[in-house]
């Protein structure tokens, strides 16, 4: 009898446990669903209240090629990112980069063909020097060929310089459109300390770093190209050391300025995140502990609002990064193509016996690295600031 009672009790306990488990799970799922709906509602409410006009205007200014990474409208892109859909796969991204490099190389093809044809003519005329042309005539012909090649290459280098100036300027304008929105959302999340250190840094980036790139680094590129070009006109003209000076000066300034910027950003970001995290947790504890009766509900509502703001902040930051990529990928691809195509032309021209032209092409191709570094530095500085804004407020 006792055994039967124990069995009945155990069966009842098992059924009770199973019932309780499913009952608690249903309640948990319902609560989770309610929380998710509350966060979603809060997210879209925050999104509707944001002033995104400057970002929308910037987005509208993108060309068709630049819109490859950010297809669709600006608001649609933002909502996709909030839902966790980037819209661009890694494979598509890499494919687009190689496509842009190939497109840039094809764009330089007419100029490079011109350089090779003139170099072939110069080599042939040089071979005729002993038979039909006297030395003075040969030098004049070689100088004319070199001048024609120099005109083509310097013209392309000037186009690359203009492209770099425009790209750095567009990155500067994007920071002016994006960071006021991010700083507003950081303030709403309680990131006063992070905003306090990041706000002047945005100003330094917009005015200081881009100014250094435009007024010092890019003129160094111009000086290096001109010195390399003039220094290869004749063996009697030696300007290699001066060309190296311009190139080295631009490189050192870039490394110094961006290293100092990243160091300050790293230290300030860590301190800001720590202080803001303590303040937010203290606010949660204070509301929950000292507000009578409804303190717990207010604290939960506080968390929902913070979660919505955090989602919007991260989505806005990610949108800014995608737009940044769409702006800089094409110019960087074109600069890489410029570098590679000059090296290729130097290799083709070298066996023809016109060493001055080959050396000039190779040296100018090395100067192109300064332009790539200028855009890459501005891009990584922008990326680091967005990353700091995204992680500075722990929610």
What are these regions (language model features)?
Residues 334-342, 346-350, 354, 369, ...:
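Membrane-helix cytosolic exit motif
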Residues 314-355, 363:
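Helical hairpin unit composed of two closely spaced alpha helices linked by a short loop
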Residues 140-150, 171-179, 208-214, 245-259, ...:
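Small-residue-enriched core segments of transmembrane alpha-helices in multipass membrane transport
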Residues 130-135, 235-250, 349-358:
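Membrane interface segments of multi-pass transport proteins and intramembrane proteases
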Residues 2-10, 14-118, 123-142, 156-171, ...:
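Gly/Ser-rich, low-complexity
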């Amino acid at each position: 009898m006792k055994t039967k009672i124990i069995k009945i009790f155990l069966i009842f306990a098992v059924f009770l446990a199973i019932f309780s488990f499913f009952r608690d799970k249903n309640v948990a799922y319902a609560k989770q669903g309610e929380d998710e709906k509350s966060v979603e509602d809060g997210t879209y409410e925050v999104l509707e209240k944001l002033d995104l006009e400057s970002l929308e205007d910037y987005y509208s200014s993108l060309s068709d090629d630049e819109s490859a990474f950010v297809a669709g409208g600006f608001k649609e892109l933002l909502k996709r990112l909030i839902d966790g859909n980037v819209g661009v796969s890694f494979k598509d991204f890499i494919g687009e980069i190689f496509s842009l490099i190939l497109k840039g190389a094809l764009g330089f093809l007419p100029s490079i063909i011109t350089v090779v044809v003139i170099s072939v003519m110069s080599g042939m005329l040089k071979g005729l020097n002993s038979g039909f042309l006297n030395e003075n005539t040969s030098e004049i012909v070689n100088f004319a060929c070199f001048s024609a090649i120099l005109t083509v290459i310097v013209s392309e280098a000037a186009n690359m310089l203009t492209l770099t100036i425009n790209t750095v300027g567009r990155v500067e304008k994007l920071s002016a459109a994006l960071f006021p929105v991010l700083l507003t959302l950081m303030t709403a999340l309680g990131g006063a300390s992070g905003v306090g250190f990041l706000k002047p840094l945005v100003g330094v980036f917009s005015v200081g770093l881009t100014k250094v790139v435009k007024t010092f680094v890019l003129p160094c590129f111009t000086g290096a190209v001109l010195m390399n070009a003039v220094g290869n006109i004749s063996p009697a003209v030696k300007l290699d050391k001066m060309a190296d000076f311009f190139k080295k000066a631009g490189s050192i300034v870039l490394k110094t300025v961006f290293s100092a910027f990243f160091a300050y950003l790293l230290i300030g970001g860590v301190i800001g995140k720590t202080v803001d995290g303590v303040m937010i947790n203290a606010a949660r504890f204070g509301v929950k502990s000292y507000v009578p009766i409804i303190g717990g509900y207010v604290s939960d509502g506080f968390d929902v609002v913070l979660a919505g703001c955090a989602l919007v902040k991260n989505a806005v930051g990610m949108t800014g990064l995608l737009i940044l990529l769409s702006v800089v990928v094409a110019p960087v691809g074109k600069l890489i193509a410029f570098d590679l195509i000059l090296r290729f032309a130097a290799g083709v021209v070298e066996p023809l016996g016109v060493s001055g032209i080959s050396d000039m092409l190779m040296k100018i191709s090395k100067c192109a690295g300064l332009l790539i570094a200028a855009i890459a530095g501005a891009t990584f500085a922008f990326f680091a600031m967005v990353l700091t804004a995204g992680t500075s407020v722990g929610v």
